[in-house]
């Protein structure tokens, strides 16, 4: 009887302990999506930044890959990683928000709008996460200025670039916000909506290395597709954000100017898209594989 009583008394003690720990475990579970997104971004930027600089030059000036590489060689190795701080800050924070907010908002919407289709709640969560990411537009703005060789003589680091914009008012930091909002919302909806279905069509993974390969392929395919589809928007964004001061031009107006400058040819508008395709393939492969790997071990 004593053994039976002791056995009967243990469960309440364990239940109480679990109740005390459950809020802390829930906090860790929620934070890990932000942490894993941040680490995935850091890993990606450190590896792919030089390729991003080549791509940026092509988007801004409509030049060939070889000419963009020659520009970077002329700038010297010392300037190769010039301007990496803004994208490092921007990408780590952006991807932390992208993955973390998407999970939090999806959970929140499912809880309060339980009768809505899952696809709808996840799409809204992805759109809201993308909109929130746009708060970090100033970092993307400064990155654009630091990568443009026309501004090399005006400032040499992130702090100086921020100071150069300050005298033009807060709005100057958010020049190019509209194309960023459009790009983020569109890309997030498709990324989170298609990530699961694409992975389901890949061969079944039985080992950790196979899971890593599948996650890389899934992220890479999505990244390449979205990078190609949003390429014209990024071309317009680069042109808008390379300007300091002056009137704020609308997205259609800037697009029309670029379209005329590039002889009204779609192939000229997509100059650099092939490099962007390969960069996005590698970048989002790294991001998705790193994110999913960290989720399993954190």
UniProtKB/Swiss-Prot annotation:
Coiled coil: none annotated. One of its GO terms (biological process) is mitochondrial NAD transmembrane transport. Keywords: Membrane, Mitochondrion, Mitochondrion inner membrane, Repeat, Transmembrane, Transmembrane helix, Transport. The chain crosses the membrane at residues 34-51, 85-105, 117-136, 180-200, 216-236, 269-290. It is found in: Mitochondrion inner membrane. One of its GO terms (cellular component) is mitochondrion. Signal peptide: none annotated. One of its GO terms (molecular function) is NAD transmembrane transporter activity. It is a multi-pass membrane protein. It catalyses: NAD(+)(in) = NAD(+)(out). Its main location: mitochondrion. The keyword Hydrolase does not apply. Gene3D superfamilies: Mitochondrial carrier domain (1.50.40.10). Solcar repeats lie at residues 28-108, 117-201, 214-297. Pfam families: Mito_carr. The keyword Iron-sulfur does not apply. Mitochondrial membrane carrier protein that mediates the import of NAD(+) into mitochondria. Mitochondrial NAD(+) is required for glycolysis and mitochondrial respiration. Compared to SLC25A52, SLC25A51-mediated transport is essential for the import of NAD(+) in mitochondria. The transport mechanism, uniport or antiport, its electrogenicity and substrate selectivity, remain to be elucidated. PANTHER family: MITOCHONDRIAL NICOTINAMIDE ADENINE DINUCLEOTIDE TRANSPORTER SLC25A51-RELATED, SD08549P. Belongs to the mitochondrial carrier (TC 2.A.29) family. This is Mitochondrial nicotinamide adenine dinucleotide transporter SLC25A51. The gene is Slc25a51.
């Amino acid at each position: 009887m004593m053994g039976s009583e002791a056995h009967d008394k243990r469960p309440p003690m364990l239940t109480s302990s679990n109740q005390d720990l459950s809020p802390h475990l829930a906090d860790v579970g929620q934070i890990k999506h932000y942490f894993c997104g941040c680490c995935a971004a850091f890993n990606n930027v450190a590896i792919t930044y030089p390729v991003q600089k080549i791509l940026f030059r092509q988007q801004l000036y409509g030049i060939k890959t070889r000419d963009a590489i020659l520009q970077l060689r002329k700038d010297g190795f010392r300037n190769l990683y010039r301007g990496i701080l803004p994208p490092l800050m921007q990408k780590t924070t952006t991807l932390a928000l992208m993955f973390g907010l998407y999970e939090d908002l999806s959970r929140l919407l499912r809880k309060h709008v339980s009768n809505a289709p899952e696809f709808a709640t996840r799409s809204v969560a992805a759109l809201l996460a993308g909109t929130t990411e746009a708060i970090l537009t100033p970092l993307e703005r400064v990155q654009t200025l630091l990568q443009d060789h026309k501004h090399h003589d005006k400032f040499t680091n992130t702090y100086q670039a921020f100071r150069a914009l300050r005298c033009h008012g807060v709005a100057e930091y958010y020049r190019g916000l509209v194309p960023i909002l459009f790009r983020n919302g569109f890309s997030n909806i498709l990324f989170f909506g298609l990530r699961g279905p694409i992975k389901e069509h890949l061969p079944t993974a039985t080992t950790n290395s196979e899971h890593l390969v599948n996650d890389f392929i899934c992220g890479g395919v999505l990244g390449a597709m979205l990078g190609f589809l949003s390429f014209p928007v990024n071309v317009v964004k680069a042109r808008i954000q390379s300007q300091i001061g002056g009137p704020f031009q609308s997205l259609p107006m800037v697009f029309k100017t670029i379209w005329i400058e590039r002889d009204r040819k779609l192939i000229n508008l997509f100059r650099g898209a092939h490099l962007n395709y390969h960069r996005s393939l590698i970048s989002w492969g790294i991001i998705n594989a790193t994110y999913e790997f960290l989720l399993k071990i954190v």
